[in-house]
Amino acid sequence: MQATAVVETASGKGYHSNGGNLQKDKPSNPKKENLLLSSNGCDEVKLTFPDDDWNSSTLEQRANNKEISNIDKMDLLEPFFSVSQDTNTESTQFQSSELEDSTDYAFLNKTYSIPYSESKLKKESLTPLSSELDPEVQKKEEVFFNILEHQDKTVGLERIYNISDANYRESAEDTQKHDTDEDSQQEYHSAEEQEYISNHLSFDQTKALDISNPEVVELGNSGYEVKCASNVEDNRVNSGSGSIISFDSLDVYGQEESLHVSKFQNSVMLREYHDLKHEKYKEQETNSMYHTVFDGSVLRSNSPGNQESQSKSGSLSPQKVLKMKIYTENMKSQINEGKDFCGNKIVENKILLHLENPSTLPQDKALETLLQPCKDCQTSWTSVFDDSIISACGYYESLQNTADSALDFSAMLPKIAVRDNQAIEDNTSLKVAHSSTTKKTCFHNIGEMCTKSLTDAASCTVTINQTVDVSTDFRACFTTSRATSARPSVVSTSSNTEITMMNKKRPDEWQNEKQKSVACSTDWSYSEDCIDTQMAITKGSGKSLSVDSLKPNGNFLNKDFLELRKACGITDLKKHPEREFQLFKDTEKDLPSMCCQKIMQRAIKAELHLLNVHYQMCRRHCCDIYKLVMENREGLNMNLSSNSAKKELGSALLSLLGDLKVRYVTLKEKIHKGIPLEELPPLSLESKLLSTFSTFASRLMKKETHVFSEADAEQDNQRAHDVDVSSNLKKTLSQMSLSSDNSHATQNISPKKDDFKNGDINADFSQLKLGDKDCRHYQETSEDWSDAKESLTGVDVSGTQGNQVEQDTWNLDLTGEMKNVEPSQRDKGYLIHVGGLCPSVSEADLRSHFQKYQVSEISIYDSTNYRYASLAFTKNSDAKIAVKEMNGIEINGKSVNVWPVKILGEYTSPLSSKNGNRISSNNLEKSTNKQIHSEFSISRLPRTRPRQLGSEQDSEVFPSDQGVKKNCKQIESAKLLPDTPVQFIPPNTLNLRSFTKIIKRLAELHPEVSRDHIINALQEVRIRHKGFLNGLSITTIVEMTSSLLKNSASS
C-alpha cells in the first residue's frame, strides 16, 4: 500500500512525499485533501492515514462528498497571542455516546482563542484508530461539519483528558510511508525506515499555516468523549475508525453564541514561523513547516462497539495561560469518506494546522528542552516528528521565560530528532525527505531562522513514556469493551499484531506500572518522576543536558545544546521549581545554624550558672574559715590583742574575696565571648586565709602550747581521776605521781626547791619510754629536740597557776628534789629492756627464755625498724641476774640486748649510754647525778605526749600495791604515740621525723647559727609557700632554708 499526502497551495499545485522526496503533484481534486489530525498522550496533533486500504473508490467517494464551498485564504498577517494566567474560561465537554465511527476534523471559520492554564501535563492513555467507516457515521459527520460552516460562529472543541496514575506511557515506533501513486495507497514500512520531522512556528511572520509532511500522525489517547456544542444544537458524533479533533478552550470573538470552554490547566503555545501569503504559495514555500501547538487538541478514533468515555479536565502544563487568537476567514472542511478510508480529510484552505506538543521524557531518560530567543523576543516551539509516526511522552512541562513582556510566558525548545538523509535548508524553511534510515538531528536556530542539521543523527535519542507501534493492528487490542484492561503500551494501525518497539526493547520503567481499565477514572496524582523530570529540565542555563538514548549507538548533541542553552536566558521565572528547591536548601542551611545558636545560648547560661555556684561556694568557704579562726581565738582565751588578730585575719579575708571576685568577673566575660568553661582555668581559691591562719595559729601555739596539750588530753577522754589542776601539764604530772592508795593528791610544785612530793619515783619507769625511742629510729629526734631551750619552756614541770620559774631554775629544783626521793620507793619496781628482737620472736618465746627469772609481765613493741620487749620482775635480784645472763643471747637466730631500766643502787640510764652527746644531758650533768638526768628526761616526756599518760595513769605500778604490768602498758602507750615538736607545725606540713632531719642538716650546714634562728628561717620558708611544705622534698626545704639563713647572715 502506498499513501500520498497532498498539500494544496495557492497556485493549485500539490506536493506529495514519495520515497522520501518531495514531488510535485497534480491533485485529482484540487479542492480536496485528506488530512487526519490527532494528538498523542503529550498533546501532539499528528497527521495519519490509519486505514490499510485505499483504492480508487476512495477518490470517487471523495468527489461525491460535500465540498467546502467558501474556503477563502486564511489571513494570518497579524497573529495575536494574548497571554493570561488568571483567565478562567469555561469549557464544554463534547461527549460521544458511541465512538464507533471516525470523527472528522474541522477547521473553524472565525477567530478563536485557546487559553492555557498553569497546570501540568498528565499522561494520556492511548486511543486506537478504527479502519471502518459506516454510512451512518458519514451522515452524522456531515451534520457536524454543517454546523461548523457558519461563518459568524466558532465552535470550540475541548479536549480534556485525565491520565491514569502512571499506567500508560507512550513509546513511538518509526514507520515510514511512501506515496506510490495518485490513488493514495498506504503502506506501512518497518520501524527502521521511520523519520522524525521537526517543525517550528513563528509569531509575526506567519499568515498561513502549511504542513511539510502531513502523511502520518500518531494517535492520541483512548477513551475520550467529545461533545460538540454550538448555538444550534449539540451533536453526538460517532466515529468508527475515524477521529475527533477537539481544540482546548476555543473562544469565539465577535459572536453572540460563543462556546465556553472549560478551564483546564495545561498550555501549549501556538507558533507560526513564516509569514506566507496565500497568493505567494509556490513550490518552495510548500516545504515551510508551521507548527500550531494546541495543548488541548486531540484527535481520537475508537473501534466499533467500544464504550464511550467522557473526557474530563486535565492538567497539561504547569505554566502560564496562553490565549491564541487565530483570525481566519471562511473555512470549510470537506469530508471525503470511503469504505476503507478512515477519516482522512482534505482541507482546501491551503493551510494545514499541525498540532504538536513538546514531549517531556521520563525521569531516568529525561529530554531537556532548550530556549532560544527570537529576533522579536518571541519564543517558539520545536517538536519531535517522524515521517511515518510522531511520538511524544505522556506528560510534559513548559517553563516560563519572560522573553516578551507582552507574552509573559516562557517556552523551552525540546531536542529534535529527525530521521532523514536530507536536511534541506531553503531560505528559512526546512525540507525533510523520507526514504532513508540515516537519522539527523535538526535544531531550529530562531535567530537565523534556519535549521542546523547534524550528522550521525542515528544516535539522537527521544525518550517517551508512551509508544505507538504501527506494525500492530489496533483493532486487535480494542475490539472488546473499553472496560477491559488496556495495558498494552502500544497501539498499531497495521495488520501486524506483534508488539515491536522502536528500540526493540521495553523500557524498564514500564515493568513496574499498574494496569488500569480505560473506562475507569483516569485522574491521577502528579507523579514524583514528573517532578524529578521537571527538576532535570528546569536546570539553569550553562548546564549540560542529560539525555538517555533509546538507540544502541546514540550521540549527545552536547555542543549544540550548550550553544543553544547559552543563547537562551531563563530569567524572571515566577514559579521556578529549582528556585523553590534552592530556597528550601537555604532554609535547611539556616535551620541548623539557628539550632546551634539556641544550643550555644543554653550552654552559656548553664556555664554561667555553674560558675556562679562555684563562686558562691568559694566565698562561703572563706567566710567559714574566718569564723572558725575567730571562734577558736576567743575560745582559747588568747592573751594577745584581739584587735590585731581581727585586723590581720579580716584583711586576709577581704583580700581573698576581692581576688576571687576579680577572677569570677574575668571568667564570666570569657564565657560570654564563647570560650567554653572547660577551657578556662578553674576558679580556685587562693589559700591566703589558710596561710594566715596557719601562721597566726603557729605563733599562738608557740606561746601557749599547754592550751593545745589540754585539748589533746580532752580528745583522748582519759580523765579518769578527779585531780583538780589548772593546766594540762599539772594534770600530766599528777597522773604520773599516783600513790599506792590510788589517792590523787594535788601536786604542789613550788618554784622553790623543797616541795617535790610523792609519786615522782614513778619517773624512773617513764624513762624507759624515752629509752625505747632511742632504741628505735627516734634516737636523732631525742637528741635534736633535747637541746632546744625553748621547748622546755612549754613543758615546765612547775605548771601551777602563776608559775614563772625559768627553765634552768626548774632543772636545778628538779635535781634537788630527785635527790630527796626516798630509797624505799625506788625498790618497788624492776624492769628490764630486751632489744634487737627479730620479727619472729613472740611473747611465748621470751617467756620460755626468761621463765627461770620469775618474769611477771612481758610486753612486746614493734616499730618500722626496731622491735623490743619490756619485762617486769618482782625482785631486783631477779632483774639483775636476768640482765647479766641474757644479755647477748640469741633468740630465734638473732642476739638481743638486755639492760635494766631501773635497778636500785646500780641504775644506769640507757639513754645516757647511747646518747652521750645530747646537749640536754650537759645541763643535767651540772648536778653530777645520772639519776637526775634520767628524771629530767622523764620530765620532758609528759610534755611530748601528755594525752596518752592520762589513759595509762592507773598503769603506774608501785611495789606496794600494783604490779609491773601497768608500767609496761604505760611504756607501750607512750612508745606508740607520734612525736610532736615543741615548735608548732601544722600536722599537714611536716611530720616530726622529716622535721628532725631538716633541723639536723641545717645545724650541720650552719653550725654558727642557733637552733632558734634555724626554726625561724624554716617557719619563714613555710609562710612563703602559703603555710604548707607538702610535696617538697627534704633536700629542697633544706636548700631554701639554708639560702634564707645565708641571706639573713649577710644582711
From Swiss-Prot:
Subunit structure: Homodimer. Interacts with TEX14.
PANTHER family: HOMOLOGOUS TO DROSOPHILA SQD (SQUID) PROTEIN (PTHR48026), RNA-BINDING PROTEIN 44 (PTHR48026:SF8)
Residues covered by region (Disordered): 1-36, 169-190, 296-318, 735-758, 939-964
Annotated GO biological process: mRNA splicing, via spliceosome
Annotated GO CC locations: catalytic step 2 spliceosome; cytoplasm; intercellular bridge
Keyword Manganese: no
Keywords from the UniProt entry: Cytoplasm, Phosphoprotein, RNA-binding
Modified residues (Phosphoserine): S388, S391, S546, S726
Function of the protein: Component of intercellular bridges during meiosis. Intercellular bridges are evolutionarily conserved structures that connect differentiating germ cells. Not required for fertility.
Compartment(s): Cytoplasm
Phosphoprotein in keyword set: yes
Compositional bias (Basic and acidic residues): 23-34, 169-180
Location (main, coarse): cytoplasm
Organism lineage string: Eukaryota, Metazoa, Chordata, Craniata, Vertebrata
Biased composition (Polar residues): 299-318, 735-750
Top-level taxon in the UniProt lineage: Eukaryota
GO MF annotation, one: RNA binding
InterPro entries, alphabetized: Nucleotide-bd_a/b_plait_sf, RBD_domain_sf, RRM_dom, TTC3/DZIP3/RBM44-like_helical
Span of domain RRM: 830-903
Protein name stated in the entry: RNA-binding protein 44
Leader sequence segment: none
One Pfam match: RRM_1
